[in-house]
């Protein structure tokens, strides 16, 4: 049996997850990151994507996150998300509104900000393709 550790997923609105898990896959800015017990201490930024949480009971739950930070320690992991929701609760309208807001912000944005916003639009679009059935 795999070793377990504590995982918390927190958004400004609420605590979404606080439980003992065996594995968490995080959409880190540098790429997908699998966190397991006794992971080396790391702090990373999180891009919009899906967090997969494998519980000690063997179930896997998926959450859509819209950026944030992950604090990883050997005994636990805390993900502070800008916004997060269980994928079953993700509404295509909410996602489309986020994409449209980012596109609207592109108007008149500086080159540096424009690049970040274009990347955000691409990440949100990909997130929609992953979690919302066609």
Swiss-Prot record:
Belongs to the ATPase epsilon chain family. Produces ATP from ADP in the presence of a proton gradient across the membrane. It holds the Pfam family ATP-synt_DE_N. F-type ATPases have 2 components, CF(1) - the catalytic core - and CF(0) - the membrane proton channel. CF(1) has five subunits: alpha(3), beta(3), gamma(1), delta(1), epsilon(1). CF(0) has three main subunits: a, b and c. NCBIfam families: ATP_synt_epsi, PRK00571.2-4. It comes from Sinorhizobium medicae (strain WSM419) (Ensifer medicae). Keywords: ATP synthesis, Cell inner membrane, Cell membrane, CF(1), Hydrogen ion transport, Ion transport, Membrane, Transport. This is ATP synthase epsilon chain. It is a peripheral membrane protein. One of its GO terms (molecular function) is ATP binding. It is found in: Cell inner membrane.
């Amino acid at each position: 049996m795999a070793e377990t550790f504590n995982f918390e997923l927190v958004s400004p609105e609420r605590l979404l997850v606080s439980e003992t898990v065996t594995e968490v896959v995080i959409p880190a800015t540098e790429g997908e990151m699998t966190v397991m017990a006794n992971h080396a201490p790391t702090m990373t930024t999180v891009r919009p994507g899906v967090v997969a949480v494998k519980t000690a009971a063997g179930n896997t739950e998926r959450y859509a996150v819209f950026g944030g930070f992950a604090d990883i320690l050997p005994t636990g992991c805390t993900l502070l998300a800008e916004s997060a929701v269980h994928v079953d609760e993700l509404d295509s309208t909410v996602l489309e509104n986020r994409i449209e807001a980012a596109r609207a912000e592109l108007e008149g944005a500086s080159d540096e900000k424009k690049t970040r916003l274009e990347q955000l639009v691409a990440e949100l679009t990909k997130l929609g393709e992953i979690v919302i059935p066609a």
